[in-house]
Amino acid sequence: MDVKSIISQMTLEEKAALCSGKDFWHLDTPQRLGIESVMVSDGPCGIRKQSDAADHLGLNASVPATSYPTGSCMACSFDRELFRRSGEVLGHACQAEDLSVLLGPAINIKRSPLGGRNFEYLSEDPYLTGELAKNYINGVQSQNVGVSVKHFAANSQEYNRMSSDSVVDERTLREIYLSAFETAVKDSKPWTIMCSYNRINGTFAAENKRLLTDILRDEWGFDGYVMSDWGATTADRVKCLEAGMELEMPGKNAANDKQIVDAVNNGTLDIKVLDTAVERILNIVLKYTENKQPETKIDFEADHEEARKIADESMVLLKNDGILPLKRSQKLAFIGKFAETPRFQGGGSSHVNSYKVTSALEAAKGLDVTYAPGYDTNTTESDEALLKEAQEAAKNADVAVVFVGITDAMESEGMDRRTLSMPKNHEALVKAVSEVQKNTVVVVMCGGCITMPWIDAVRGVLYAYLGGEAVGTATLDLLFGDVNPSGKLAETFPRRLEDNPSYLYFFGDEQNKTEYREGVFVGYRYYDKKNMDVLFPFGYGLSYTTFEYSNLTLDKSKMKDTDTLTVSVNVRNTGKVKGKEVVQLYVGMPESHTIRPVKELRGFEKVELEPGEEKTVTFTLAKRAFAYYRTDISDWYVESGDYTIMAAKSSRDIACTATVNVTSTTQIKRVYTMNSTIEEIMESPVGREILGKMMAQNPLAQADADDIGMGEAMARMMAEMPLRALLSFGGDSVPAGAGEMLLKQLNA
């Protein structure tokens, strides 16, 4: 069907109606013109199609669906193909349920470990987030189902999320909070984007023309439609439309539709703006309806197995002093309510009515396993009787496996966490069991990171995150070594909450402003810059085998920023079992003239190796791998100089390094003023010549610095002195207008 022809036949009221939902999940299409209504649905880790009572917080029933591991779990796979595959099976399920757009992926950056929706988000690192997200998008959209990449932008907290103001400087916004969205838009062309609730530097996302039009469309080339998060549209519907927010959800808000109609009729809204919005929405509607696959069926058993495989690749082994893998001949104690009733998904809009859930206790049928609940999930207080029962079970076992984590009541959409500690009764259980059983392994089920005051008292820790409906089976796959753990942390685990760079400002001020004062130093970027000890670093994860890196090679030692650099490194499995290693590539500039992180992730690859096998892993680095965002030129800029290329097992375990010299091809014309320093002016040949003569007559420059005991300090003071100050010290020896003459020559 021809979209422009359809628009020409639509009434003004029909156009306005299309720009808001028909109900909670459907679009209000002009059905009299043969355009059927389409449905959108949550969520990133399993579809949440509601047929009856609808809501956006997971309160009412939805159709049965497969619950896959959450974003925080899946991201630890560091596996692009896994993300593409997971998107593909979700897109297939959407076709079967007649859903035109899946509301995900959620790719906000984990600014703080307190973030209430961190379980949905992928990482603290924008490069990792963008790479995984674009593959997920490709997978979903390969099934002719759209995605809605969310929440655009700088939406890293739940506290006052509908009104908070994220105050972020431009460089930080570009490098950290917009970067993953940019990758997703440019590389995968998502059908839709969902704008967030919050304000960004004073302007609500739904009204933010600079974000929704200037950056998203004009810079990045986005050609789909932008929908609001549910209830994110402001009182000024016309302003939102003019900013580039086409679809208001949910519907039906007759008053807002009337705003649009009235604005067109009284001439305050150009009909072309409305027609453009309608065209963008119809393009996506028809892309789905004209290529629907109504014969598609869901194979729930196959999808359940897929959920298990994803969890197998994603869970992270954090500690193992030889206790793992377990043996099926051992007498085991499974302790903790989560062994019987696992926590496998988050609360809120991503909550799925799971097809079936397999617990660890159920998966262990046929083995010699004693179970003790250990705690009551409806309270945080310990029960002495439950603790004693747990200790008895532990004492009579060869190995005690304790299942603990964070409860639904502490971690959900709509609220942020207030602590990194587990509930008191979970902490007490680990302590009680480890006191009577030296062979204690802890399995943690939660959406984000926690502190571990008991870490030295146990022999093993498996971090299951929220592992989806097959979490129990996958947990046993890893505990028994049927699958070799290969997950790596996609976020840093700090030792204390207070160590996090956003700690002082996370919940905002009395004006509801949340200042991102840490700038680009989010996650490992901060901990590395501070050289701060952490509990577990970004990119960390153990295996049942070992890997050795060697022969890091660059295809050139010098390059321009317009060139590409090919990097290769050899990886050998030096252990006795097959395993997968995530090779991480970081780039840093030790002698940078600007404030930059020590290193930043710029590549990763997951490689499988048999015992004794060696493979060469190759990466290609282009301009952005070396660049930072310069606000004075409003563009990405590569500073000339030496860069260190690091092949690593984690952000703190660097295996090999090499150096490449990069020359910038961007010429930046410096504008000199009376406030320019002597050091800055001396960088110019003209400045060196003229200032040399002026300083020869300056009493400060003539002084013998060593005689007055200042030495290097005197030289530093002179270097940092502004031109206006130097001229004032010159007295009569400096001719009138000398400064203006110098500036004219410098700026010529």
Regions found by a protein language model. Give the residues of each.
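Low-complexity, Pro/Ser/Thr- and charge-rich linker/hinge segments at domain boundaries
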Residues: 663-683
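Terminal connector regions
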Residues: 623-667
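Conserved, compact domain cores that house catalytic/ligand-binding motifs in diverse enzymes
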Residues: 676-740
